[in-house]
């Protein structure tokens, strides 16, 4: 598996879960690392991690903070060329799962006429010119299959990237849920704000970036808190917009009501202990945290952002949907959800059968079939 990345994201965790499941079944899995991918996952299985460049070299590149992260990744990929070529020659019978923006490995798989089976997993909502180049180059590979995580991406990929060969395109959900998540969600939360039974806790989880649109969530919560003073908003995650969000919280006089807890090792217990989960993103794939929240039993609201969340909650069957980037619509939905807790719990219960498709065992089996057949 190779998925060059600056920092560990949900997509990397998806690939790692697939790798771990296949490894547990006796398959030999190797993770080829260029950047920070799989940095935050615990490797307690037989999966071999291979750093194509020394970790110290990549950390050195990250020191130059004036460099755009994309430039850092380009430099890292250049340094990884010779080690990757050596790996190709030593592992001619290997198959490859490529993720995120794998233009670097694809070029050398083509140049050296590698006939291995290759699966290119397309995640999120690809919009960049670089991704267009990835698609164009991937078509030169002789034995490639494409995977997308939900049906909604089919039309998008076809229309935006001249993708006519839908026969090579498979829909396989991401590996999001497993027994460990359910078990960890049952752990006790120590923070005092979760101990007050008179408080109603709303939660948002994710990187503090423009994509996640936490500023809209805070503005909507500001309106809600006027109606329901007992409400508390908890936000888990770090990111470049943290200072901006803190200033917004201060300007709205919400410093006692909005709690930024940063990155936590076990977000699941916080979601399980909350009354309502909100995903306010401007764009998403299927929405991993949305799936996690539903999977552990927390009622959910999501924006109708492109391209996957609406499909994840089945057009509102499993939660509430609000207009993308609309403060007022989100405020109304939060009010509605808290006023109808029994209905919201019913929606969660109705999602249980559908959520099974996101369990790692099922997802890994589907990927394995692509390589076997």
Where are these regions (language model features)?
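Aromatic "clamp/platform" in nucleotide-sugar-dependent glycosyltransferases that forms part
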Residues: 263, 282
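A short, active-site helix/loop in glycosyltransferases that binds the activated sugar's phosphate group
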Residues: 144-171, 176-180
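Conserved acidic donor-binding segment of nucleotide-sugar-dependent glycosyltransferases
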Residues: 315-327, 336-341
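N-terminal strand-loop element at the rim of the active site
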Residues: 1-9, 13-15, 21-71, 162-163
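Short hydrophobic beta-strand element within catalytic cores of glycosyltransferases
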Residues: 299-303
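Short His-centered aromatic/hydrophobic patch
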Residues: 77-80, 97-104, 122
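Short acidic/histidine- and often glycine-rich active-site loop of Leloir-type glycosyltransferases
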Residues: 292, 305-316, 320-321
């Amino acid at each position: 598996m190779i998925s060059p990345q600056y920092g560990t994201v949900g997509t990397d965790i998806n690939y790692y879960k697939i790798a771990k499941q296949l490894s547990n079944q006796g398959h030999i899995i190797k993770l080829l690392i260029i950047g920070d991918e799989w940095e935050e996952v615990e490797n307690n299985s037989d999966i071999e991690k291979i750093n194509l460049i020394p970790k110290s070299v990549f950390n050195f590149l990250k020191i130059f903070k004036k460099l755009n992260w994309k430039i850092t990744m380009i430099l890292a990929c250049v340094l990884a060329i010779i080690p990757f070529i050596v790996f190709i020659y030593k592992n001619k019978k290997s198959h490859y799962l490529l993720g995120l923006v794998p233009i670097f490995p694809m070029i050398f798989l083509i140049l050296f006429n590698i006939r291995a089976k290759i699966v290119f997993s397309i995640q999120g909502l690809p919009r960049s010119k670089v991704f267009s180049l990835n698609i164009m180059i991937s078509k030169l590979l002789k034995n490639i299959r494409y995977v997308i995580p939900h049906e909604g991406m089919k039309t998008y990929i076809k229309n935006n990237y001249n993708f006519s060969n839908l026969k090579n395109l498979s829909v396989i959900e991401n590996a999001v849920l497993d027994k460990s998540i359910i078990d960890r969600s049952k752990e006790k939360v120590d923070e005092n704000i979760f101990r007050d039974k008179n408080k109603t806790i709303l939660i948002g989880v994710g990187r503090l970036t423009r994509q996640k649109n936490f500023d809209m969530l805070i503005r909507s919560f500001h309106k809600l808190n006027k109606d329901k003073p007992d409400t508390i908003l908890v936000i888990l995650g770090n990111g470049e917009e943290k200072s901006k969000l803190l200033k917004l919280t201060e300007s709205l006089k919400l410093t006692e009501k909005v709690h930024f807890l940063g990155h936590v090792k076990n977000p699941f217990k916080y979601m399980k202990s909350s009354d309502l989960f909100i995903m306010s993103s401007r764009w998403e794939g299927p929405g991993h945290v949305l799936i996690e929240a539903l999977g552990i039993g927390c009622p959910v609201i999501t924006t109708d952002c492109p391209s996957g969340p609406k499909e994840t909650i089945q057009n509102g069957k499993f939660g509430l949907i609000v207009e993308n980037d609309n403060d007022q619509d989100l405020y109304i939905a939060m009010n509605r959800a808290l006023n109808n807790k029994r209905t919201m719990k019913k929606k969660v219960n109705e999602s249980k059968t559908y959520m099974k498709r996101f369990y790692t065992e099922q997802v890994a089996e589907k990927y394995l079939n692509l390589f076997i057949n």
